């Protein structure tokens, strides 16, 4: 709970200069632009929630709740690991769900039970909750198979209004995922360098710093997933 990071507990990177310990720096490969390098952080969050635990196996069926930037990137990471992935959202999320299709994901509006249980009737092998609302965790417990896993990366202030008994009855592993570490950034940079992880669908625009408010509003409205702000 006391862990700090740039932009969380200490000042972030939206400044002309930043003082950083040399041991925290990463060398950007020559074939990665600064625009894409700036996207390493959310990619590392998704890597931490999806790949780092070692749960995902080729051929697994994974459900991801929440088609925001982290949810889409979690889905992309699970696809890279060889899983079949469905990203779940609401009617208002159609634009973001379309972006997920470019990563080869199934997209679902509403109930994911049919897709999750379509193979053997038992449910999904794993669920990533990137929505951070009480309902998404409740749905995750509904679609997960016995001995499956749930990775909760989404934050939310709402108290749980349902029983956790299904977690016990199904012997489900529930894992919280917060932030990332230095080696994860290095792995993400290698994925970008090799071209295995394509960020074109996620990066919706590059804006001069004077248009920072436009960049944030476009993300907030769901028009784009992520934006990059360049200093002038």
Residue ranges and their predicted role:
Residues 1-25:
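Glycine-rich phosphate/adenylate-binding loop and adjacent beta-alpha elements
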Residues 32-115:
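Mid-domain Rossmann-like dinucleotide-binding core that forms the NAD(H)/NADP(H) cofactor-binding site
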Residues 54-58, 86, 98, 102-173:
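Glycine-rich cofactor phosphate-binding loops and adjacent beta1-alpha1 units
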Residues 138-142, 182-232:
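C-terminal hydrophobic helical "lid"/dimerization subdomain
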Residues 24-35, 122, 170-171:
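Glycine/charged-rich beta-loop-alpha catalytic/anionic-binding loops adjacent to active sites
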Residues 89-93, 156, 180:
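Residues in the short beta-alpha loop(s) of Rossmann-like NAD(P)-binding domains
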Residues 153-157, 177-179, 203, 207:
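Short strand-turn motif at the edge of the Rossmann-like AdoMet-binding core
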